[in-house]
């Protein structure tokens, strides 16, 4: 009998078969470039830049844009934005540019052109007679790139927010060094006619390329990033949250991870810190891996590292951070357990509340205050029935360690203390909770104080 088969009976008939499952075509893919080739796309025939400008501008005024033509124009316009590379630019072994070289966004990627003509002749443009200036080209490019940022704003009750963002971005591209090329509210009207720009692979690729360039090169038109900046660390919310977390608690990544007391963290931490990636390399392809098509399913997203994401934001909630209170809970990743651990870590790193003395007249006054607080804490812990007398050394002011926190959790049977619950209620009850947010979770779970 083959070792990979099982045997059982169905209606008294012996059946032998090999269990098989569907192959996962959506496994996490790491963005490291292994073949030494720049990321690339294929577009239609390069247009005459001035003809393309007139056609695209006419289409924008009519709120009717052809995505293929928009992409072709954005790629052709890259050559207008020349700058000087400040340092040798290398990523994953690929030499993008040398220090002092004159470069434009196209040097970052490989854009292949076919002989397929665009729809320029059919798209209009007759209402624009004279050839555009450099400032007008830059403004149109900027407005087109802003469509990506607007399409990334999703959720309930975002209409007014989107309109305000669109208006502010329009204002940027009608003042020097740019030039006004459209009437007020044109950007929002165009967005409404086609709201899914962020799902168009070639458009996303070009937006990421522009952002990678202007993040690296000082340029008079660097304000173009107002529409592209959302491509930086896109689908990286798990890793970004962890980075913010260690800065908040002022520990190294290694020391911070010693506090992660849950078996489900193991796979997530292994996934998040896979060797061979350029997570800490400035201006790497890694920063824009999603836009550049280097990863279909990010191993760094909040869903990929859900337990880590939940814990970090429960600690953030304990610290009163609005961003954490508004973040969306990953419901499938043990939010109740993560809220317990988050309470203990919040107390460890933040204390019992927001208000405490932080500034003193001199070092002696600061030292006296610290000693007084340590004595007060030790006295209160000695009276706490949950603490065994021979375990009290774990709670002294001199001992702030993962071992101490772990012992505290175990002695309380893996449950939050009332001081933790009171803190959670205090920070979440006065916050206008969004649906499925951490604030809503805390309000629902701990509203009765237990």
UniProtKB/Swiss-Prot annotation:
Sorted UniProt keywords: Capsid protein, Helical capsid protein, Host cytoplasm, Phosphoprotein, Ribonucleoprotein, RNA-binding, Superantigen, Viral nucleoprotein, Virion
Example GO molecular function: RNA binding
Superkingdom of this protein's organism: Viruses
Sections of the chain in a coiled coil: none
Any Pfam family hit: Rhabdo_ncap
More about this protein: Displays a superantigen activity in human and mouse, activating mostly V-beta-8 subtypes of T-cell receptor.
Record's protein name: Nucleoprotein
Native organism: Mokola virus
Gene name per UniProt: N
């Amino acid at each position: 009998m083959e070792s990979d088969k099982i045997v059982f009976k169905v209606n008294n008939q012996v059946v032998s078969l090999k269990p098989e499952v569907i192959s996962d075509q959506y496994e996490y893919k790491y963005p490291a470039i292994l073949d030494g080739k720049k990321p690339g796309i294929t577009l239609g025939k390069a247009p005459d830049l001035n003809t393309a400008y007139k056609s695209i501008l006419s289409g924008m005024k009519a709120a009717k844009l052809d995505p293929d033509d928009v992409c072709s124009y954005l790629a052709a316009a890259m050559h207008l934005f020349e700058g000087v590379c400040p340092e040798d630019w290398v990523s994953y072994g690929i030499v993008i540019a040398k220090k002092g070289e004159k470069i434009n966004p196209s040097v970052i990627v490989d854009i292949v052109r076919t002989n397929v003509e665009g729809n320029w002749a059919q798209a209009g443009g007759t209402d624009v007679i004279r050839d555009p200036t450099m400032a007008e080209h830059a403004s149109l490019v900027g407005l087109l790139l802003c469509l990506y940022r607007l399409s990334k704003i999703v959720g309930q009750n975002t209409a007014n927010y989107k309109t305000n963002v669109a208006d502010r971005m329009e204002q940027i591209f009608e003042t020097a060094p740019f030039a006004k090329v459209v009437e007020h509210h044109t950007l929002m009207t165009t967005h409404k006619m086609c709201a899914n720009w962020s799902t168009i692979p070639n458009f996303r690729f070009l937006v990421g390329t522009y952002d990678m360039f202007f993040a690296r090169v000082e340029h008079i038109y660097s304000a173009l990033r107002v529409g592209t900046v959302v491509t930086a660390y896109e689908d990286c919310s798990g890793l970004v949250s962890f980075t913010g977390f260690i800065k908040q608690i002022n520990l190294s990544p290694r020391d911070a991870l010693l506090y992660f007391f849950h078996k489900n963290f193991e796979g997530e931490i292994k996934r998040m810190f896979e060797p061979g990636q350029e997570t800490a390399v400035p201006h790497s392809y890694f920063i824009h891996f999603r836009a550049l098509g280097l990863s279909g399913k990010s191993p760094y997203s909040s869903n990929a590292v859900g337990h880590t994401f939940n814990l970090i934001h429960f600690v953030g909630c304990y610290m009163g951070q609005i961003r954490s209170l508004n973040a969306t809970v990953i419901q499938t990743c043990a939010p109740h357990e993560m809220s317990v651990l988050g309470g203990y870590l919040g107390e460890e790193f933040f204390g019992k509340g927001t208000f405490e003395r932080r500034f003193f007249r001199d070092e002696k006054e600061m030292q006296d205050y610290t000693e007084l607080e340590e004595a007060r804490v030790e006295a209160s812990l000695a009276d706490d029935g949950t603490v065994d007398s021979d375990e009290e050394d774990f709670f002294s002011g001199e001992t702030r360690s993962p071992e101490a926190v772990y012992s505290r959790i175990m002695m309380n049977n893996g449950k939050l203390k009332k001081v933790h619950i009171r803190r959670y209620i205090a920070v979440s009850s006065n916050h206008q909770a969004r649906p499925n947010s951490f604030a809503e979770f805390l309000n629902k779970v701990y509203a009765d104080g237990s």
